[in-house]
């Protein structure tokens, strides 16, 4: 029954209604109603997990997400991680989390993965890591491309939260399942192409005000271009590494 997960489902569904968020779903029949699958999700916001989870819920499935291990430092989040089947990932040593994810997939669960790893400031697809493709190959399960669009208006990098009763529309679209090839590069390329096609289709049907920060530059928005976003991310990573080095130096004193 998983009482904590059930409580989360009720709470998230209730909160979605309370703030007037309108979620439109497409292609949910592509999420299998039984058996394992990797759900490959684009990453544009801090809250795109909840429309993705609700999409699985529409299919009477519970999605197990992979989440960076630092989130365990937050007590309430750590409690939820332990009781919702979430898989913590140490980005510097992720083999253990990978093995758990493959085990869950083989056991018939669906695992949500962000192949971009971090939020895309450009709101375009970044380069993919190989984890999703490798999991699908090793567990012998399909990959379902899933696009979430609109949640970046609620809370994304470099911008304040916008979580009140704003009635922000969100679109969730699932594409046909893909099956992993022996070549990880080939699988990644096919997955990225499928997700990019689906993303563009969803974007074309969504209203985008000119100049809005959450709209990609190619669509008339003011979001960073892919190259500009890459520069920002490199600076962010460098600053994070500097702070980590400072902490480690202090701990050795």
Where are these regions (language model features)?
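Catalytic-site beta-strand/loop segments enriched in glycine and acidic/polar residues
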Residues: 104-132
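Hydrophobic/aromatic ligand-binding patch that stacks against planar heteroaromatic rings
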Residues: 55, 80, 103, 134-138
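A charged, well-structured terminal subsegment
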Residues: 99-107, 170-201
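Catalytic core of membrane glycerolipid acyltransferases/transacylases, capturing the structured
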Residues: 32-93
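A cross-family acyltransferase "interaction/gating" segment
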Residues: 124-189, 212-219, 225-226
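Acidic, Ser/Thr-rich low-complexity intrinsically disordered segments
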Residues: 214-253
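A transmembrane-helix-recognition feature enriched in membrane-embedded lipid enzymes
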Residues: 1-27, 51, 59, 75-84
């Amino acid at each position: 029954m998983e009482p904590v997960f059930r409580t989360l489902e009720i709470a998230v569904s209730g909160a979605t209604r309370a703030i007037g968020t309108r979620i439109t779903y497409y292609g949910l029949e592509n999420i299998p109603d039984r058996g394992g699958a990797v759900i490959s999700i684009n990453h544009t916001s801090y809250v795109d997990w909840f429309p993705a989870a609700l999409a699985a819920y529409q299919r009477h499935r519970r999605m197990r997400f992979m989440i960076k291990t630092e989130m365990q430092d937050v007590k309430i989040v750590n409690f939820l991680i332990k009781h919702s089947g979430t898989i913590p990932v140490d980005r510097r040593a992720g083999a253990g989390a990978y093995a758990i994810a493959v085990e869950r997939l083989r056991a018939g669960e669906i695992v949500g993965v962000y192949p971009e790893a971090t939020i895309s400031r450009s709101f375009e697809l970044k380069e993919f890591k190989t984890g999703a493709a490798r999991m699908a190959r090793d567990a012998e399960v399909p990959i379902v491309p899933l696009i979430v669009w609109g949640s970046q208006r609620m809370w994304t990098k470099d911008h304040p939260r916008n979580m009140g009763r704003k009635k922000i529309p969100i679109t969730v679209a699932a594409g046909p399942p893909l099956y992993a090839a022996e070549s990880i590069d080939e699988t990644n390329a096919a997955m990225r192409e499928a997700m990019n096609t689906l993303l563009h289709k969803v974007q074309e049907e969504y209203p985008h005000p000119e100049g809005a920060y959450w709209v990609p530059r190619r669509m008339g928005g003011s979001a960073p271009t892919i190259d500009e976003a890459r520069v920002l991310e490199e600076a962010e990573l460098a600053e994070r590494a500097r702070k980590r080095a400072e902490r480690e130096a202090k701990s050795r004193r």
